[in-house]
Amino acid sequence: MGNSRFFLIMGAALFLGCGGPTLAQRQVESAPAVHALQDGQFEDAQKKANLVLDKEAQTPEARLVRAITRYRATTKQLYLDGRTAVIGAFDGGLNQRYLHSTAEQAEADLAAVDEDLAAAQKGSNVSLELCLACWKDVDWNGDGRVNIRDERLLQIEVDEKGEELPEDDPRRRPTFRFDHGDIAWARAFVGFERAVLDVVLAYDFSGINEAMREREREGAKRIVFRLIDKSRIAAAKTRLLESIEQSAACRRAYLEETDDDREWVPNPRQK
């Protein structure tokens, strides 16, 4: 009897000792990464999130911070590489190898973003407060300078009546509280982007070059894009179905919300 009681006590102690961190502990651990992200210090935020995740890989707040910083880096690089591919296509012809490597890298990077979002989605009571329009000196389009378009990109420029908000109106720069439903929204968004990239990777678009040469001679009659990887079409279908699933989860989460706290996407009962 004494031995049985001993093993029961030890088992309970081990079980409780192996439990994950509490919400308060998670928030304290992730606070430096969250604050860096709130200040628009994206690289620093990712480094600090990685430090947290090195200790506890499933910390949802740190995963969410890293997902956002990874997404920003991925989309910025994709924009730069895509612009290079388009300019090259008009200048000397489409570089299929460059286009393929660009799309392949972007899809892999977005897969890592989704992995972080999926981990964050499993957490309980996950939330993140961000004022997106408060991020300053961010070169969103990667042209090497920050102009008024960069500064206003994430601002709310008009009110509910369609009238322009004054520059000093705080409604231009609201702070949103992102929560569980918004993570599903983000996963759906990323999934649709990955599906597009899978379609790009499925085809050889170098037929554009032949069509352009034909047009110079006698006018192009058609452009042929050859399917080179059927598995990518199947992957695109999978991504689309997953995204539809996440969209449905997002809607359910929004409709179930009973609070009204700085919503990114409000339900009919929220502001």
Per-range role (PLM):
Residues M1-L8:
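Bacterial N-terminal signal peptides that target proteins for export
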Residues L8-G17:
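Bacterial N-terminal signal peptides
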Residues G19-P32:
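Bacterial Sec signal peptide processing site at the extreme N-terminus
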Residues V28-E29, H35-L37, E43-K47, R70-K271:
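Short coil/linker segments at helix-helix boundaries
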Residues A57-Q58, N125:
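Short coil turns that delineate tetratricopeptide repeat
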Residues R66-A67:
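Residue-level signature of tetratricopeptide-repeat
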